[in-house]
């Protein structure tokens, strides 16, 4: 307080000396003195130094002084204002936008330092604003705006702004690196300057033990390495420095750096990559670090085990530069580097206007001339609208020109072909093909071109299969397109030669084995002799063999038993006719896939026989009905037959010999007395088809003998006729609908007894040559031995031998070899045993673990009921099968 009073007193003395007139005792002076003392008491000690000038600020401004001040303000020199900005390195004080525009309007001379300084400040603000706005979504829009600015002049400004922004927000480091990668392709000096400054910044921060600055600079360098702006040797040198004398902080920085560049190092420098991890393992085993740091290293090893799935080299949305366009700078950590600090300070440019024109030319080359034409287009919009309205009326009147040469389609195929051939791997090819602007509805052309290029190769290349697989898994549209291609190529596969056919089959086999297309495409395949060609069968063979090689036979069988695929496999495994079933079985067996046909083999044995169609012919008849012209005998129509019969009763033997060679017209028979309609029964044995063998004439004619005969009509009616002979029951064999040779035939004849006979019908040539057929029959002899007599001859009876002869034209006589074969029932039983044995072997082979599960019935055969198949046929033959044998 004493100092304040003393200073206050000194101030008052000085005040009285400067104003001698106030020393009077006038009233005005006293009032002024009191007022001054009151104001001084309210001021602080620092403000009391300005007390002598306080009275000047309290002077009332007159209107004339205000006008003069306003006039002087309006007449400020813009150069003087700009000079204030140039005095300081930071750029001076803030200038309001309105005042800045006024200054810029007054500065029109380009070659003045003031104008260039204003443009420098504007460039710095523009670059800084664009860098602060960039993110993943708008990076493609920010980069063209950045090229609009003269970043060659402001390259130091760009480096300073982006380093400052990256240090403030580390998660945006990949974005800043991607933007720098694009700029580096056009202006490599900018990328080199940024990398140089980052390396120098890391060295300084490492020497100062500035952890935050080390993390930011090393992180930025890591992403520049991923973008291939910097060589990987810089990252390895930084890791070596950090791991030479490991501390908790250096290990943390090294782990962060390796996590960012680990995926890239694993590709380009595997040896150094493994060496770094060995160093980490050694440090971890030493155990001199904190528990937290050890845990960080363990997490790094887990990241390596996961192949850096959370730290990709370049994120997909930031992959903006082609690999061959990038420029890599080989700068080492130990080099003498120049950061060029002077580039960040304003310098007067005497050739400012010329340099700006040069950059405009470069900008036009990079961005094109679209930006320059925007203003002109805006001015011409009004004129174009008026002209377009007039042109529309004229264009409506002109006829449309349709290009019939398909020039656009040819150009599209050419571009697709060149794209495929210029690609290194399938991923690059798919990426380029997706960028092609396909017209609507022309997607199938791309698929066709991929298949055609594949077919042109000398051998199948998996490159094309991977392309088709990738497209099918991209969207459902491409999958349906390739499924349509499968149907189209299967229908036209006969147009391709064998080598091209093989490549196409392997291509679709790859798509099917990887489930790229659905197996429903087999709906278009019908595997029959009439519906397939040699090319289509080769196509299916190659495709199925490739699928078996990819999936395995067991997986293929399980896939074909999938209930969802059953409606689409009826054409591949037909069950409509026996010949189609047999063809499918033989086809798959011949290509080594007989395991697919095990169920069809069983089905073929039990499948229902189709009803025979009644056919009339001159020489051959399926039954001895009244509508037939001739009555067929046991052998051919024109034949000479011998029969030997041996019957035993009471240990007595008898032989009968009969020979007949005539054609007996049915018209000569008394229809009132002899009425016969045969019911045909299919033989129980399996028929074997042979195109070379002739038809078997196996229908039977009625025996004109005395006795009582009983026969069944096809409708199931029983017709009896009485005669003075024995009673006979007969049944005709199957018709000749299928041209097959029947080896065995069962007949039942004799008086009140049933026997077993084995007969073999002559071949077609033998019938033409009218040769003989020999049949043997053995049956128990009845009490009264009736003898069949021909109506054209007198009836003679012998106890031991009967000889009947009918006259016919002379023909050559030939005897066939005598043979005796097992019954059809025995053959069927043996065949069923072998099939069951083979099925058991197949199940054991399919299940290597030894679990013999029952054979899975094919889904396309489940609808058949075996009971219904056997019901009708067994009912007819059970009565015969249950009869005890007489001998």
From Swiss-Prot:
A GO biological-process term: mRNA cis splicing, via spliceosome
GO CC annotation: catalytic step 2 spliceosome; cytoplasm; Prp19 complex; U2-type spliceosomal complex
Ranges of biased composition (kind: Acidic residues): 368-394
Major location category of this protein: cytoplasm
Residue ranges constituting the MIF4G domain according to the UniProt record: 124-307
Keyword Cytoplasm: yes
Gene from which this protein is expressed: cwf22
Protein name: Pre-mRNA-splicing factor cwf22
InterPro entries recorded: ARM-type_fold, CWC22_splicing_factor, Initiation_fac_eIF4g_MI, MIF4G-like_typ-3
Residues annotated with Phosphoserine modification: 662
Function: May be involved in pre-mRNA splicing.
Biased composition annotated in UniProt, kind: Basic and acidic residues: 677-690, 717-726
Annotated MI domain residues: 411-527
Pfam families: MA3, MIF4G
Region described as Disordered: 1-27, 366-401, 607-834, 867-887
């Amino acid at each position: 307080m004493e100092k304040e009073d003393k200073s206050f007193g000194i101030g008052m003395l000085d005040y009285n000396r400067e104003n001698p007139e106030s020393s009077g005792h006038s009233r005005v002076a006293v009032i002024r003195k009191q007022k001054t003392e009151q104001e001084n008491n309210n001021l602080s000690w620092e403000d009391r130094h300005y007390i002598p000038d306080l009275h000047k600020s309290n002077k009332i401004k007159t209107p004339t002084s205000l006008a003069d001040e306003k006039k002087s303000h309006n007449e400020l020199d813009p150069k003087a204002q700009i000079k204030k900005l140039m005095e300081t390195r930071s750029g001076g004080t803030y200038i309001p936008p309105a005042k800045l525009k006024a200054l810029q309007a007054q500065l029109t001379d380009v070659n003045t330092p003031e104008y260039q300084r204003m443009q420098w400040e504007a460039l710095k603000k523009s670059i800084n604003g664009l860098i602060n706005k960039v993110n993943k979504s708008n990076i493609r829009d920010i980069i063209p705006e950045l090229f609009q600015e003269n970043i060659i002049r402001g390259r130091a400004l760009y480096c300073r702004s982006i380093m400052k922004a990256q240090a403030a927000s580390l998660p945006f480091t990949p974005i800043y690196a991607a933007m720098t990668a694009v700029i580096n392709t056009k202006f490599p000096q900018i990328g080199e300057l940024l990398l140089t400054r980052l390396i120098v910044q890391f060295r300084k921060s490492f020497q100062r033990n500035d952890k935050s600055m080390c993390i930011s600079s090393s992180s930025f360098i890591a992403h520049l390495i991923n973008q291939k702006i910097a060589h990987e040797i810089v990252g390895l040198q930084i890791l070596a420095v950090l791991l030479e004398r490991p501390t908790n902080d250096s290990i943390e920085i090294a782990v962060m750096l390796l996590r960012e560049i680990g995926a890239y190092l694993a590709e380009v420098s595997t040896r150094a990559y493994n060496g770094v991890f060995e160093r980490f393992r050694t440090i971890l085993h030493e155990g001199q670090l904190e528990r937290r740091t050890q845990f960080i290293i363990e997490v790094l090893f887990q990241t390596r085990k996961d192949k850096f799935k959370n730290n990709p080299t370049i994120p997909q949305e930031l992959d903006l530069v082609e690999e061959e366009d990038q420029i890599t700078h080989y700068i080492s950590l130990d080099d003498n580097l120049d950061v060029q600090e002077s580039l960040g300070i304003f310098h007067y440019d005497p050739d400012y206007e010329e340099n700006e024109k040069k950059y405009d030319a470069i900008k036009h080359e990079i961005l094109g001339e679209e930006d320059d034409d925007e203003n002109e287009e805006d001015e011409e919009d009004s004129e174009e609208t008026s002209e377009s309205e007039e042109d529309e009326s004229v264009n409506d009147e002109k006829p449309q020109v349709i290009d019939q040469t398909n020039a656009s389609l040819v150009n599209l195929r050419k571009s697709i072909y060149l794209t495929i051939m210029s690609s290194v791997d399938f991923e690059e090819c798919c990426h380029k093909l997706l960028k092609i602007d396909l017209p609507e509805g022309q997607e199938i052309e791309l698929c066709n071109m991929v298949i055609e290029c594949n077919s042109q190769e000398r051998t199948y290349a998996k490159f094309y299969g991977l392309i088709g697989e990738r497209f099918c898994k991209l969207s459902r549209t491409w999958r349906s397109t390739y499924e349509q291609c499968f149907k189209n190529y299967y229908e036209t596969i006969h147009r391709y030669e064998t080598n091209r056919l093989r490549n196409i089959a392997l291509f679709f086999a790859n798509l099917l084995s990887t489930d790229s297309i659905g197996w429903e495409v087999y709906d278009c395949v019908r595997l029959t002799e009439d519906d397939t060609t040699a090319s289509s069968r080769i196509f299916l063979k190659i495709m199925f063999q490739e699928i078996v090689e990819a999936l395995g036979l067991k997986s293929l069988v399980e896939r074909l038993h999938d209930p969802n695929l059953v409606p689409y496999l009826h054409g591949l495994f037909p069950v409509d006719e026996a010949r189609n079933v047999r063809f499918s079985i033989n086809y798959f067996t011949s290509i080594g896939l007989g395991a697919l046909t095990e169920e069809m083999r069983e089905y073929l044995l039990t499948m229902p026989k189709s009803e025979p169609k009644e056919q009339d012919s001159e020489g051959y008849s399926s039954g001895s009905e009244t509508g037939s012209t001739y009555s067929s005998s046991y052998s051919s129509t024109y034949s000479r037959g011998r029969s030997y019969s041996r019957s035993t009763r009471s240990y007595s033997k008898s032989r009968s010999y009969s020979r007949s060679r005539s054609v007996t017209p049915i018209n000569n028979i008394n229809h009132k007395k002899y009425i016969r309609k045969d019911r045909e029964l299919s033989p129980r044995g399996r028929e074997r088809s042979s195109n070379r063998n002739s038809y078997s004439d196996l229908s039977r004619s009625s025996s004109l003998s005395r006795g009582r005969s009983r026969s069944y009509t096809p409708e199931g009616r029983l017709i009896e006729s009485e005669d003075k002979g024995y009673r006979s029951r007969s049944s005709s064999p199957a018709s000749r609908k299928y041209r097959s040779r029947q080896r065995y035939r069962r007949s039942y004849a004799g008086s009140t007894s049933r026997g077993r006979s084995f007969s073999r019908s002559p071949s077609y040539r033998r019938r033409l040559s009218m040769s003989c057929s020999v049949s043997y029959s053995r049956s128990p002899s009845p009490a009264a031995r009736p003898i069949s007599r021909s109506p054209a001859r007198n009836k003679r009876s012998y106890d031991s031998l009967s000889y009947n002869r009918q006259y016919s034209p002379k023909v050559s006589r030939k005897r066939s070899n005598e043979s005796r074969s097992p019954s059809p029932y025995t053959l069927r039983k043996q065949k069923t045993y072998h099939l069951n044995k083979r099925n058991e072997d197949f199940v054991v082979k399919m299940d290597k673990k030894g679990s013999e599960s029952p054979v899975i019935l094919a889904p396309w055969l489940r609808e058949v009921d075996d009971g219904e198949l056997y019901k009708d046929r067994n009912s007819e033959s059970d009565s015969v099968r249950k009869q005890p044998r007489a001998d």
